[in-house]
Amino acid sequence: MLLEQVIYIMCNLEVSKNSSRNKLWSLIFGIQLLIIDQLVKSFFINFLKKTPEIAISIFKYFKISYVWNYGISFGIFNYYYDISNNFFLIVNTIIVLCICYLITKAKKLLQFNAYMLIIIGGTSNIIDRMLYGAVFDFIDIYLIIFNLADLYIFVGTILLVIYYSYYE
């Protein structure tokens, strides 16, 4: 009941041309998320590169691992790294630019913030590909290994599903 009310309110907050302050705060928050993701990745790259084969177990199914992903989600195309990095760098950039266009059309704050999360996550993974030639994944939950940028993309996508299921 409370969750439905919160979702209803979030789906109906307007993003008008006069609400540049809301957009500015969302942008500042997004840039902070991007910086956090890059700093955390840099920390774990430097911390774990001495022993990349050893994962740090925190809980039974939660570890910090050292994994370079040359492909896409879940390691698909991971073994074609000689051609995949440039290909996925171009594809990721095109997708982020398309979502940058969509964010300009956002009418509600939830929609705007969802697009912002996806843009920030995609941009962080693009930065990884440009700097390292692959995306660094370190959060290891049982069978899935990902990074904070992937989490931003996932949460942004879930928010869009919520938005479109309630609003459209």
From Swiss-Prot:
Pfam families: Peptidase_A8 (PF01252). Its main location: membrane. It comes from the Bacteria. It is found in: Cell inner membrane. InterPro entries: Peptidase_A8 (IPR001872). It comes from Orientia tsutsugamushi (strain Ikeda) (Rickettsia tsutsugamushi). GO terms for molecular function: aspartic-type endopeptidase activity. Its EC number is 3.4.23.36. The lineage of its organism: Bacteria, Pseudomonadati, Pseudomonadota, Alphaproteobacteria, Rickettsiales. It is a multi-pass membrane protein. Coiled coil: none annotated. One of its GO terms (biological process) is proteolysis. This is Lipoprotein signal peptidase. It catalyses: Release of signal peptides from bacterial membrane prolipoproteins. Hydrolyzes -Xaa-Yaa-Zaa-|-(S,diacylglyceryl)Cys-, in which Xaa is hydrophobic (preferably Leu), and Yaa (Ala or Ser) and Zaa (Gly or Ala) have small, neutral side chains.
